[in-house]
Amino acid sequence: THRMAREIREELEKQNFHVVELRMCELRDSDLRDELELADLVLVGTSTINRDAPPQAWHAMSLFSLVTPKAKIAAAFGSFGWSGEAVKLVEERLKGLRFKMPVPGLTLRFSPTDDNLRECREFAGQVAAQVVGTE
């Protein structure tokens, strides 16, 4: 998932987006909340562990309800080994919080191949187009 995030971030930066990458396991709640308030776009990357997103992802997402999602676009992506449910679960949570979700989540099995990294760049381009379309 980290390689996916790096590829997505680099593609967004090529398109002149200011990207703040936050690692949920290393973040204070107040810092996450502050960054969410400033963001036009929220991308959540998560792996699937035991058919779910890890606890750190759910804790971070619990803070999303403190943010007004008006006009905020969100999307999810992640890697999995066997089942891959985490991205869909995260998408459901984001939709429930009323984030706009115009681009389907991206899931990749195991470590990304060169073709998968291309998919990550395409995903970033699709999300970027949605943000640009709302400005």
Residue ranges and their predicted role:
Residues 1-3:
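Glycine-rich phosphate/diphosphate-binding loop of Rossmann-like nucleotide-binding domains
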Residues 6-25, 32-135:
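FMN-binding flavodoxin-like domain, especially the glycine-rich phosphate-binding loop
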